[in-house]
Amino acid sequence: MKKTGLIAVTVVAALLAGCSEGDLRQLGKDTEKALRDAGDALEELAGQAEGPLREAAAHAMDAADEARQASEEFRKNPTTETRQALRRSKRRLDDVSRELEELLDDAPAGVRSALHHALDSLTELRHRIQRELDSS
């Protein structure tokens, strides 16, 4: 490869690395917003729900908090260990989402809207975390 070609490749690689870092920062901000939205939706659901649905909402809030902590740690220090913790937190979000979905049909009509909102927020959060994992 000629010297000019090598320089061009180096410049493009440097530009892509800079874009990637900025994209990762934006992705982190998007994940934080999704975490806040999910937390708000789950708090609303927990305030309206009773029995097993309230318990499932509490599990989901715990899972969202775990995901927040794992996401922060992963952004600060993207190691194999923090990546695994983030993957575990995503799997837990998957589990609590399924738990909430199973309760949807039996949920009182007045709570279904909050439950749908919580499920939508959890889905968005799970997608953001997956993008964070895929982008790093």
Identify the function of each model-found stretch.
Residues 8-15:
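Bacterial N-terminal signal peptides
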Residues 1-8:
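Bacterial N-terminal signal peptides that target proteins for export
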Residues 33-40, 44-136:
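Surface-exposed, polar/charged faces of alpha-helical domains
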Residues 18-23:
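Bacterial signal peptide processing site
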Residues 1, 15-17:
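Long, low-complexity interaction regions most often at the N-terminus
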